[in-house]
Amino acid sequence: MLPIVELFQNRKLTIYLPEGYYESEERYAVVYVQDDGDLIDPKDSDVLQKIRELTAANQLPGLLFVGIESFDRNDEYTPFISPNIFEPESGKQFGGNASVYADFLANELKPYIDSKYRTLPTREHTGIMGFSFGGLISVYSGLRYPDVFGRVGSFSGSFWFPGIVDWIEQLSIHDTGQRLYMNLGHAEGFGRTNGQQWMVPNSKRVYQYLLQNGFHEDSIRQVIYESNFHSFDLGVQYVPEALQWLFNEE
């Protein structure tokens, strides 16, 4: 089934409907995917096909995916204004507009999707996920709107970003029933001299804090795989099993 491409507030959306959507009246859980849906884009990997196979085998519920175009990920996916470490001599900054973008996701995009498609709108049926900065903004949005996004996936999330750990550690987190999946390579950022050197230690710190404050062992999972690189190709391989853990009730 080909994806549906449409515009919402001048932003491209790529909608991947579950198989059999038009042949039934069933309602489906929704997963909002950053970076134009790169984690499930058939051009980038075979992840979507694996998801379809798991669903056909009754190992994963049918899911509706919404790939969301970013106008500028360095602005929309970053929680705070900070020097752009990728262009240190340019004077450019990360825009720090994550709060505006998260509000758009929760209060504008989600109601639109729920009104147009047959969705299960409750938080336990609403997921959000992304890679790198996309993982960062997914966790940020999930923690900012726990009553909206009940299933959160971060693949090599950029927790090296200045201020994000402090922001998370000042939150008053309660047992919201959320599930949070995080993964990263065991040596991502090692040898770097910029802020990315904090990728692994900050990710572990976030996991431990959340585990001790509001989440339980059965509601948060961190997977650390063998890799020295910040690799999309490696991180994306874990998407099917992450979705199984996030959406299959144990």
Q: Which positions does each model-derived feature cover?
A:
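Non-catalytic cap/lid and distal C-terminal segments of serine-dependent acyl enzymes
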Residues: 1-250
